[in-house]
């Protein structure tokens, strides 16, 4: 982590766990993905930068999933699990039942595998994560709900969008200012589940 990075410095000053907090702040300010009272499912939650922002907005239950541990965040049920684990469906459904959640208003994914520096491999891995997130999410997202996913842009991005955009009224691609400029990282936003 570059300790001279302005978002890193700002995150430390404002008590956010990561510079990624500013990505979700910017995206939500622009697209109004989450609102007060929303129930949210979050993938790739550790260390909790997005979770802090989401909880501050929704002041409602968040179910957060990550393969890495995460320190507690208010109103958050944390599931430490790999999203490719067969039990992920059961674990999420159990957490939903325990918290009287029928469907989610919004589902957010900042999940990413470790990068290799090989662009095609990193893109493919991010594509597979996004596919898995969508497989988990579509049956659990309410009509009118929204999804955000991080992906390394590449030759399968258009195919991914074409496959899933039919479930929504519209989609957007964005790259927040807090994303590193040289990164191929983008956020795909699917809005208003049909």
Swiss-Prot record:
An annotated Gene Ontology molecular function: rRNA (uridine-2'-O-)-methyltransferase activity
Reaction(s) the record says it catalyses: uridine(2552) in 23S rRNA + S-adenosyl-L-methionine = 2'-O-methyluridine(2552) in 23S rRNA + S-adenosyl-L-homocysteine + H(+)
Entry's transmembrane regions: none
Gene3D superfamilies linked to this entry: Vaccinia Virus protein VP39
Cystine residue pairs: none
Keyword Transmembrane helix among UniProt keywords: no
Compartments reported by the entry: Cytoplasm
Main location: cytoplasm
InterPro entries in alphabetical order: RNA_methyltr_RlmE, RNA_MeTrfase_FtsJ_dom, rRNA-MeTfrase_E, SAM-dependent_MTases_sf
Active site, renumbered: 150 (proton acceptor)
Its EC number(s): 2.1.1.166
A GO CC term attached to the entry: cytoplasm
Keyword vocabulary terms for this entry: Cytoplasm, Methyltransferase, rRNA processing, S-adenosyl-L-methionine, Transferase
Residues that hold S-adenosyl-L-methionine according to the record: 48, 50, 66, 82, 110
Record-stated family: Belongs to the class I-like SAM-binding methyltransferase superfamily. RNA methyltransferase RlmE family.
Function noted in UniProt: Specifically methylates the uridine in position 2552 of 23S rRNA at the 2'-O position of the ribose in the fully assembled 50S ribosomal subunit.
Protein name (record): Ribosomal RNA large subunit methyltransferase E
Organism per entry: Picrophilus torridus (strain ATCC 700027 / DSM 9790 / JCM 10055 / NBRC 100828 / KAW 2/3)
Source lineage: Archaea, Methanobacteriati, Thermoplasmatota, Thermoplasmata, Thermoplasmatales
Gene name in the database record: rlmE
């Amino acid at each position: 982590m570059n300790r001279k990075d302005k978002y890193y410095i700002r995150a430390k000053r404002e008590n956010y766990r990561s510079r990624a907090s500013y990505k979700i702040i910017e995206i939500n300010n622009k697209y109004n993905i989450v609102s007060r009272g929303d129930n949210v499912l979050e993938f790739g939650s550790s260390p909790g930068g997005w979770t802090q922002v989401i909880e501050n907005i929704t002041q409602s239950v968040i179910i957060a999933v990550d393969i890495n541990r995460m320190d507690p965040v208010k109103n958050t049920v944390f599931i430490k699990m790999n999203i490719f684990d067969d039990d992920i469906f059961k674990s999420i459904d159990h957490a939903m039942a325990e918290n009287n959640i029928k469907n989610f208003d919004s589902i957010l994914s900042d999940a990413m595998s470790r990068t290799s520096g090989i662009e095609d491999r990193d893109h493919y891995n991010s594509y597979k994560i996004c596919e898995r997130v969508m497989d988990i999410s579509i049956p659990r997202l309410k009509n009118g709900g929204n999804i955000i996913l991080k992906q390394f842009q590449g030759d399968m991005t258009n195919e991914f969008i074409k496959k899933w955009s039919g479930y929504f009224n519209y989609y957007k691609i964005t790259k927040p200012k807090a994303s590193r400029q040289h990164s191929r990282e983008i956020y795909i936003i699917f809005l208003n589940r049909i």
